[in-house]
Amino acid sequence: MSKTHFGFESVEETEKAKKVAGVFHSVASNYDLMNDLMSAGMHRAWKAFTIAQANVRPGFKVLDIAAGTGDLTKSFAKAAGPTGEVWHTDINESMLRVGRDRLLDKGIVTPSLLCDAEKIPFPDNYFDVVTVAFGLRNMTHKDAALAEMRRVTKPGGRVMVLEFSKVWDPLKKAYDLYSFKVLPWLGDKFAKDAESYRYLAESIRMHPDQDTLKTMMEQAGLDAVKYYNLSGGVVALHLGTKY
């Protein structure tokens, strides 16, 4: 049985999937509140930048992976319009349910699907844009997921990965203090769940840095891969094109 990491802990691959599922079942109901608290609302700006870079137009087909509460899905669905096709997907039933309900509450009628990014249930060359926001670091086989994202993207289409990344060195000390002390405290105080937010901090540190992820996307077969550092590298948006 192969080993992988769950935060800083070494676990069996099958065990990681169960542990990650447990984290997101736990945080689903407070997910948006905690995002606002943890990022001081900055996650909205990061997502807005991603939406602008996606440049979704009427009639586009878009796959939103690990879509959670549906922030990106909502904007993509509005941009694609009635002639488009936007899929709200997540591997976690609790997150999918919360996102689906919130989309419906906002008048967004678009399909929601339980979906494993390592085994995407769509044909080759189907989507104009494939996105994953704050989900790749939780996947056991990131290389397989990136290859699947490329497979279902049309020639000329784009794969976009918005994810926590490696902060600039001058920010590192303060960022570590915030991540390992403040985040678990916020999780405990507002969600009664310090452990899930401790995992968040650890999973960010274990995620590939900007250049490593760029190389992984290239190895998955994507071309013209580039990235933008946001908020001093706290987050990076990677983009790759399928030729």
From Swiss-Prot:
Pathway: Quinol/quinone metabolism; menaquinone biosynthesis; menaquinol from 1,4-dihydroxy-2-naphthoate: step 2/2; Cofactor biosynthesis; ubiquinone biosynthesis. GO terms for biological process: aerobic respiration; menaquinone biosynthetic process; methylation. S-adenosyl-L-methionine binds at residues 69, 90, 116-117. It catalyses: a 2-demethylmenaquinol + S-adenosyl-L-methionine = a menaquinol + S-adenosyl-L-homocysteine + H(+); a 2-methoxy-6-(all-trans-polyprenyl)benzene-1,4-diol + S-adenosyl-L-methionine = a 5-methoxy-2-methyl-3-(all-trans-polyprenyl)benzene-1,4-diol + S-adenosyl-L-homocysteine + H(+). Its EC number is 2.1.1.163, 2.1.1.201. Keywords: Menaquinone biosynthesis, Methyltransferase, S-adenosyl-L-methionine, Transferase, Ubiquinone biosynthesis. One of its GO terms (molecular function) is 2-methoxy-6-polyprenyl-1,4-benzoquinol methyltransferase activity. Belongs to the class I-like SAM-binding methyltransferase superfamily. MenG/UbiE family. PANTHER family: 2-METHOXY-6-POLYPRENYL-1,4-BENZOQUINOL METHYLASE, MITOCHONDRIAL (PTHR43591:SF24), METHYLTRANSFERASE (PTHR43591). HAMAP family: MenG_UbiE_methyltr. Methyltransferase required for the conversion of demethylmenaquinol (DMKH2) to menaquinol (MKH2) and the conversion of 2-polyprenyl-6-methoxy-1,4-benzoquinol (DDMQH2) to 2-polyprenyl-3-methyl-6-methoxy-1,4-benzoquinol (DMQH2). This is Ubiquinone/menaquinone biosynthesis C-methyltransferase UbiE. The gene is ubiE.
